[in-house]
Amino acid sequence: MIKNFNSLANTEVRKKALLILESGLSSAQPKNFLKSFVSKNHILLGKNQILLSNYKRIFVVAYGKAADSMAEYVSKKINVSQGIVVVPKYTNSSITSKRFKTFYSGHPLPDKESVRAGRAVQKFVNSCTKEDFLLFLISGGGSSLLALPDEITLTEKKYVTKLLLQSGATIDEFNCVRKHLSMI
């Protein structure tokens, strides 16, 4: 996983530290943590198992820096009818299925594509019926990748985001402000 492992592991202590790091990185990979919640035609939420065959269609909205790998894993386990994936610009998305529409949005600052993705997700969600199952897969970076400014312009939202970045705000402080600036 660490590309230059051998050159970095030049002492026993460094080797052990790198092995610990690799173990942590591996456990954070979507396929490793999603397998606890997603299996063939089942979703596990807490102690509740959802049988997906009870639904007419299965929809997926995945957004964030790990969106494509989460959506890819899920699409191998369940029969996804259609989905939207929103990832940062310059990401080499691994999604090859034509059932997914992929948006490449701005991060950490939202951009026009973030708004376009936000509108697409809003329309997509509104098209679902009670016979459908909608699964959201959310990872870090989602609030800038998927933006739908509420009563402010995109330029104003970008300005507020820049101020928060420059101030050293924590992610909790970021989210507290941003949830009031977006419809999603």
Stretch-by-stretch model annotation:
Residues 1-139, 143-184:
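N-terminal loops that bind phosphate or other acidic moieties
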